[in-house]
């Protein structure tokens, strides 16, 4: 049930909109409609006020009616507005709000629409390894790679390779504060590793870490290896050529004994007689011996 204040407000709005002074009332059709509306509103108001007369006092609507007339109708602009007739078109223009973009605009907004649409995550698998094929000239020969033996690849304990290709073996002696003990130089890394294993087993026993633990007790004696090395060193030495001393026989001028001019052995020199050595002919131009081709000279 509406309150009296709400009913009075509705009645005032209807009177203001459908009154003869309003522009809407100029249209005869609207006037007829307004008259019918006023009659219905008056009937409804009479019914409402008739039913509520017992409980409510009569309401004075003079104040509510006069206030909007003072605000809206006293100004000259409102009078001019009332004097000008208005015509309202009953036809309703229906505008098409469906936006149909052109092909050019559609192409421009396509990336934005696609970016807004969230795509499901993709599972990216790693591509297969690709091998590059290098095309070379027909005359070029492929490089021949020398196969590296397992012996050169593997590093043995206690073995070092020299720059010239030999392999040296050494071990640290725990009894001498970890000082290095030289074990020798070998042609192959396996020989050097076996020499290290033998020395490590002698120093540490069963606690030694060996290169070939299954060969314990099967090592060859190194005496033979020492003899081979010594023989190889002897072959590398330069042999000294001994000079053979020639012997000459002295000429016996006076019919005396002949003595060797130069001896080939020291033993013959020791067996000489001193008297024979003193009688050795002089090799001087003053010598009286004609076989040398010089005549005897006289000193004045």
UniProtKB/Swiss-Prot annotation:
Keywords: Activator, DNA-binding, Ethylene signaling pathway, Nucleus, Plant defense, Transcription, Transcription regulation. Its main location: nucleus. InterPro entries: AP2/ERF_dom (IPR001471), AP2/ERF_dom_sf (IPR036955), DNA-bd_dom_sf (IPR016177), ERF_plant (IPR044808). PROSITE patterns: AP2_ERF. Induction: Ethylene induction is completely dependent on a functional ETHYLENE-INSENSITIVE2 (EIN2). Wounding as well as cold stress induction does not require EIN2. Transcripts accumulate strongly in cycloheximide-treated plants, a protein synthesis inhibitor. Seems to not be influenced by jasmonate, Alternaria brassicicola, exogenous abscisic acid (ABA), cold, heat, NaCl or drought stress. GO terms for cellular component: nucleus. Pfam families: AP2 (PF00847). Residues 35-48 have a biased composition (Low complexity). It is found in: Nucleus. Residues 28-48 are annotated as: Disordered. GO terms for biological process: defense response; ethylene-activated signaling pathway; response to auxin; response to cold. GO terms for molecular function: DNA-binding transcription factor activity; transcription cis-regulatory region binding. Residues 155-213 bind DNA. Acts as a transcriptional activator. Binds to the GCC-box pathogenesis-related promoter element. Involved in the regulation of gene expression by stress factors and by components of stress signal transduction pathways. Belongs to the AP2/ERF transcription factor family. ERF subfamily. The AP2/ERF domain binds specifically to the 5'-GCCGCC-3' motif. The affinity of this binding is higher if the seventh amino-acid of this domain is basic. PANTHER family: DNA-BINDING DOMAIN, ETHYLENE-RESPONSIVE TRANSCRIPTION FACTOR ERF105. This is Ethylene-responsive transcription factor 5.
């Amino acid at each position: 049930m509406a309150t009296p204040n709400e009913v009075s407000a509705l009645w005032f709005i209807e009177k203001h909109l459908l009154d003869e002074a309003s522009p809407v009332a100029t249209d005869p059709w609207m006037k007829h409609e307004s008259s019918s509306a006023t009659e219905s509103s008056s009937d409804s108001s009479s019914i409402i006020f008739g039913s509520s007369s017992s409980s409510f006092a009569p309401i004075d609507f003079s104040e509510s009616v006069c206030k909007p007339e003072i605000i809206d109708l006293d100004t000259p602009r409102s009078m001019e507005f009332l004097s000008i007739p208005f015509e309202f078109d009953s036809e309703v223009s229906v505008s098409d709000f469906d936006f149909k973009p052109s092909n050019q605009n559609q192409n421009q907004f396509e990336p934005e629409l696609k970016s807004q649409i969230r795509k499901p995550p993709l599972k990216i698998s790693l591509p297969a390894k690709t091998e590059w094929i290098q095309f070379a000239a027909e005359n070029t020969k492929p490089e021949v790679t020398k196969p590296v033996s397992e012996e050169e690849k593997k590093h043995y304990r206690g073995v070092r390779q020299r720059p010239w290709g030999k392999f040296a073996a050494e071990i640290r002696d725990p009894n001498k504060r970890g000082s290095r003990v030289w074990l020798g130089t070998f042609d192959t890394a396996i020989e050097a590793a076996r020499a290290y294993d033998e020395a490590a087993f002698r120093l540490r026993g069963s606690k030694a870490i060996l290169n070939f633990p299954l060969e314990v007790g099967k090592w060859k004696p190194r005496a033979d290896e020492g003899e081979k090395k010594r023989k190889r060193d002897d072959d590398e030495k330069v042999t000294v050529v001994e000079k053979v001393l020639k012997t000459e026989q002295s000429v016996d001028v006076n019919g005396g004994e002949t003595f060797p001019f130069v001896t080939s052995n020291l033993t013959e020199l020791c067996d000489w007689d001193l008297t024979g050595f003193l009688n050795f002919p002089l090799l001087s131009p003053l010598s009286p011996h004609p076989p040398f081709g010089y005549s005897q000279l006289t000193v004045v």
